Amino acid sequence: MGLPPCGTDAAHHELLSSSAFYAARQSAMEGTWSAEQPMLEDFEVLEVPVVVHVIHRGSPVGVDENISDAQVLSALVALNEDFRKVAGSNGDGLGVDVFVEFVLAKRTPEGTPTTGIVRVDGTVVPGYAENGLASSSFLPGADQVAVKSLTTWYGEDYLNVFVVPEINGNNGGGGVQGFSYTGPTGDARDGVTLLYNAFGTTGTLKPGRTLNRTLTHEVGHHLSLLHTFYDTDDCEAEGDCTTAGDRVCDTPVTLENG
């Protein structure tokens, strides 16, 4: 059986067992869920600065995995349509406006102006030229900490989005299309990782990945939303909706692909 298109659960469990920082943050988050913190009532829109790291393999801008600025911008537009439920867009479905908007960063951590798009050749890291980046240590590909350390912006001031040519040696094809961590990691891993051809709504895209839903899905994870089938393996009774599945009571616990 091949790997699922979302590699978040595997990456999350691996880091949970190896990082005391990440485990502590997850424990704090679950405590917040259990306390059922009330929703803010002023509905102020939260603006999140985004830096997109295009980690290519030497291609010119706009060729192969070194995607164009236009493709990056299309991803941000579609992401906001989904999170803000923009009327008349593909995001205007059954969901709700979550009052979060994503904008390309305008300053670097050092305070200098930026477009919010950073390009770096990842082939200096062993294995990246051949297999891209590995979402977990037991899978093919370059070590993600080594690759992301070339470019990541540390701290909690930005959402790092890493665009890569391959994940786990999949040649940009099937298997994992993207992965994230459900909250801050405290190191270079922090953020969202996606295949270049599953990112955006225009540009170098593959069939079935033209609505930018992979980015929307993985950003949801980064904002601490789990799968509805998280840690479920049978049709047991739902029980406490704050501790089962995605820990959110507006969605029932489900089985993966079931």
How would you name each of these model-derived features?
Residues 1-155, 164:
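Propeptide-to-catalytic entry region of secreted or membrane-anchored zinc metalloproteases
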Residues 48-54, 101-104, 158-163, 190-196, ...:
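Structural recognition of the beta-strand scaffold that forms the well-ordered cores
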Residues 55-58, 108-110, 165-170, 198-201, ...:
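Solvent-exposed loop/turn segments at secondary-structure junctions
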Residues 66-74, 205-210, 214:
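Soluble non-cytosolic domains of exported or imported proteins
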Residues 73-76, 80, 191, 213-216:
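Extracytoplasmic/secreted envelope proteins and their assembly/folding machinery
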Residues 76, 80-87, 163-165, 196-198, ...:
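Sec/Tat-exported extracytoplasmic proteins
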Residues 174-207:
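Active-site scaffold of zinc-dependent metalloenzymes
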Residues 206-258:
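The catalytic-center signature of Zn2+-dependent metalloproteases
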